[in-house]
């Protein structure tokens, strides 16, 4: 088990001190057949369940956008750091990869809007196990920390929804993928619900 002082996108670490299972490298499960990268990488996705992490993990929301020729994942939100909760901006730029059965690869930057010294760069890999694109997705994602943070790996499996208030039949997804969400942390268990993000005018995405 490792204790890491960092806060990472996609629920890799939702608080400053977090124990995750130790892994030596990313172990991606098989990607869904005929995965359509373009359809997945558009619009908003909300994390509703997570194998590892905290309430912040299952409160994560992110969106995809195109900036010129680049595909960008935006994961702005609240993260815990040094005993407090702070708002961070997150930008993940997709690296070129046209092979549908290969993990989606991104290079990411996460930084505090109040303290420029709180900035982290990391590599992200994503494999989609299953999705209908319009309602839900099951995603395995793995992060490689930079050398200054130990050069190790952390992974997680997430259940995503387009609308966190309109959930699919999880039993069907479990049977299809031969997995169980029983031990996963759920957005529905967050006391008082997930916090609202600041207005876009106050924290305009760059």
Curated annotation (Swiss-Prot):
Keywords for the protein's UniProt record, in alphabetical order: Blood coagulation cascade inhibiting toxin, Glycoprotein, Hemostasis impairing toxin, Secreted, Signal, Toxin
Function of the molecule: Suppresses activation of the host plasma kallikrein-kinin system, leading to inhibition of the intrinsic coagulation pathway. Blocks host coagulation factor XII (F12) and prekallikrein (KLKB1) reciprocal activation without affecting their amidolytic activities. Blocks binding of host F12 and high molecular weight kininogen (KNG1) to negatively charged surfaces. Attenuates generation of bradykinin by interfering with activation of host kallikrein-kinin system.
Species, as recorded: Triatoma infestans
A GO cellular component entry from the record: extracellular region
Glycosylated residue positions: 25, 55, 178
Family that this chain belongs to: Belongs to the calycin superfamily. Triabin family.
Subunit structure: Interacts with host coagulation factor XII (F12) (inactive and activated) (via amino acids 1-77). Interacts with host high molecular weight kininogen (KNG1) (via amino acids 402-532).
Pfam families given in the database record: Triabin
CDD domains on file: lipocalin_LTBP1-like
GO molecular function: toxin activity
Regulation: Zn(2+) modulates binding to host coagulation factor XII (F12) and high molecular weight kininogen (KNG1).
InterPro entries assigned: Calycin, Triabi/Procalin
Localization terms from the record: Secreted
Expression across tissues: Salivary gland (at protein level).
Signal peptide span: 1-18
Name of protein: Triafestin-2
Top-level taxon of the source organism: Eukaryota
One of the GO biological process terms: symbiont-mediated perturbation of host defenses
């Amino acid at each position: 088990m490792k204790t890491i002082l960092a806060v990472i996108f996609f629920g890799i670490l939702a608080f400053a001190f977090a124990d995750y299972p130790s892994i030596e490298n990313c172990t991606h499960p098989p990607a869904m057949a005929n995965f359509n990268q373009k359809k997945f990488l558009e619009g908003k996705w909300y994390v509703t369940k997570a194998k590892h992490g905290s309430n912040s993990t299952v409160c994560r929301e992110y969106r995809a956008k195109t900036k010129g020729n680049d595909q960008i994942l935006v994961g702005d939100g609240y993260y815990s750091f040094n005993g407090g909760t702070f708002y961070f901006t997150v930008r993940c730029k997709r690296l070129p990869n046209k092979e549908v059965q290969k993990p989606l690869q991104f290079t990411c930057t996460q930084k505090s809007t109040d303290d420029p010294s709180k900035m982290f760069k990391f590599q992200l890999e994503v494999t989609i196990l299953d999705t209908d694109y319009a309602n839900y997705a099951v995603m395995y994602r793995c992060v490689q920390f930079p050398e200054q943070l130990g050069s190790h790996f952390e992974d997680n499996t997430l259940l995503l929804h387009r609308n966190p208030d309109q959930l699919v039949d999880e039993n069907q997804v479990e049977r299809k993928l031969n997995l169980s969400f029983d031990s996963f942390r759920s957005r529905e268990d967050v006391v008082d619900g997930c916090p609202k993000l600041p207005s876009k005018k106050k924290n305009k995405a760059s």
